[in-house]
Amino acid sequence: DLVLCSRSSGTLQRNDTVLLEAGNGQTQIKRIIGLPGEQVYIDRRTGTVMIDGRELEEDFGTTLPGTYLDYPLTLGTDEYFVLGDNREDSEDSRNYDPVSSSQIKGIIYMTLRSRKTDS
């Protein structure tokens, strides 16, 4: 797959897909779920993502029961909570700290899928 992203300093918004340098030093693609100053909580029983006490309506994936935050996490003034769209197999803000804007290298605006070839 080929991913095209913009390095412009546009405003980051919820549901933006971003290219970032994660806390583990790897470059990853994640979706912004929580914005600076918001409180994020993931319910242990249902996997429901809550932002400032309200259920987040998601079109991009669901968080599985058992992948949660033990406590509500309030994001700092330059922190973003990110999740992978493949929640079942993603290392993201559930595993490492929220990311700062300096870790976000660009907003993805197009993904070109490679064709699978039969071999």
Mark where each language-model region is.
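Phosphate/adenylate-binding glycine loop and adjacent helical scaffold
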Residues: 84
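Short beta-alpha junctions and helix-cap segments that line functional grooves
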Residues: 29, 93-94
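Active-site metal-binding motif and surrounding structural segment of the metallo-beta-lactamase
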Residues: 73-79
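Short C-terminal domain-edge/linker segments immediately following a structured domain
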Residues: 33, 62-65, 79, 110-117
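Feature for secretory/organellar precursors and membrane-associated catalytic proteins
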Residues: 1-72
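Active-site environment of divalent metal-dependent phosphoester hydrolases
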Residues: 89-90
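A structural signal for short, hydrophobic beta-strand segments that form beta-sheets
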Residues: 32, 39, 78, 104-108
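Extracytoplasmic/periplasmic terminal helices and flexible tails
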Residues: 94-101, 106-119
